[in-house]
Amino acid sequence: MRFYNTLSKHIEEFKENEPGIVRMYVCGPTVYGLIHIGNARPMVVFDALRRYLEYRGYRVIMVQNFTDIDDKIINKSIEFSVDFKDISETFIAEYWRDSMALGVRAPNFSPKTSDFVPEIINAIQNLIAKNHAYVVDGDVYFSVRSFPRYGELSHRSIDELKAGARIDLNEKKRDPLDFALWKSAKPGEPYWKSPWGNGRPGWHIECSVMSTKLLGTTLDIHAGGEDLIFPHHENEKAQSEALTGKTFVKYWLHNGMIKYTGDKMSKSTGNIFLLREALKKYGADALKIFFLSKHYRSPIEFSEKALSSAAKAATRINETFLRFESEFSFAIPKQDSWINEKRSIFIDSLDDDFNTPRALALIFELVNSLNRAMDDGNERDALKIYHLLRREFCPVLGLFDLPERADNRSIEELVKILIDVRAELRAKKQYELSDMIRSKLRKVGIELKDMPQGTTYTFIKEV
């Protein structure tokens, strides 16, 4: 198994720290609004990576944080005259709602910054004691020049970073690149007591503390969007390694951005398409196909055309599964060389820097083969293909999850009853009632098709 490591800028063989266990940290959202499809890409990609690691036999311990102390959250709480926790807790709940609708599994741990303030204060005290941080008027800053390897992750020297990076110009700091570990409280802001006075944690220190407290000193994988490489991940790496003297992360994985009208999709600019709107219009599987059809490190240009195409592909696959389930049995096929060959192709694809486009291409190829096998009445081959798709390949990528399909069985039985009722109405020439049933079903996303051999149905997304 090989991954492109942002730190080395090379594809490297994956070797976990502790045999059989992968410790994985993914940067989560700052919770001050509803998430958009740009936020959803790392959710889908790294959920699929976690599933694949488990498929390959690893035990994965995954942590994804919530940043619930931040200027944007505080500003919104002031705007609406509510406590900052009312804002953060509201949007954490909305995040879980969207995450469940998308079919992304919850991480093992979902820490919030506000729950780790004592540990953050302790870490800052240790950095001060090691001469990596200094106090100015109640603020605490990390001294970038105290850490010679600063810039390793973003592959830029300190002078290059000073010339072109987004840095906070502040007269209190000894160096413009130095960053805040602790911010002194301003009037009306939430605060915590500390040795340096009332204040709150800076952005970067929270991830270092939460990740190492929950996963240990050295993480196997740290993942997030490429926009976090600098300054966030660079700063995380510096302060963590300055604190422990050990390697913070073995493999840094970063996904490409989603472009919307040519620019990065971002809440702060308003250049967004909300995830729940996309889910309502296209469905979870269409969005996952859209994300996974591009290599995770490549940018994706958002377009209605691309999402519509992904929705059609999802419908086609779903209809194929429905057809098999209505015509054939669910026996477990015997393993043979053909199954092992396809499984090897799937594994080789994802072992190669998690190449989901190649894995998806195999899934699409097998869906076509499954339809041909059913057309030919070849139950043996159909069963083998269905098993690989339904029980192995699709679940690994989080597609067409079985729990969701199991919940749909009662819906499918009800639709069949309505089709029978409608057939009786048509036989009695009660066409107005028959058409009403068709119309009502279409409004809830079910389209009936009257064929010479009888009525069939499909699930549609845009109604």
UniProtKB/Swiss-Prot annotation:
Pfam families: DALR_2 (PF09190), tRNA-synt_1e (PF01406). A motif ('HIGH' region) lies at residues 29-39. It is found in: Cytoplasm. Zn(2+) binds at C27, C207, H232, E236. One of its GO terms (molecular function) is zinc ion binding. A motif ('KMSKS' region) lies at residues 264-268. Its main location: cytoplasm. Binds 1 zinc ion per subunit. It catalyses: tRNA(Cys) + L-cysteine + ATP = L-cysteinyl-tRNA(Cys) + AMP + diphosphate. CDD domains: CysRS_core. ATP binds at K267. It is an enzyme of class 6 (ligase). Its EC number is 6.1.1.16. InterPro entries: Cys-tRNA-ligase (IPR015803), Cys-tRNA-synt_Ia_DALR (IPR015273), Cys-tRNA/MSH_ligase (IPR024909), Rossmann-like_a/b/a_fold (IPR014729), tRNA-synt_1_cat_dom (IPR032678), tRNAsynth_Ia_anticodon-bd (IPR009080). NCBIfam families: cysS (TIGR00435). This is Cysteine--tRNA ligase. The gene is cysS.
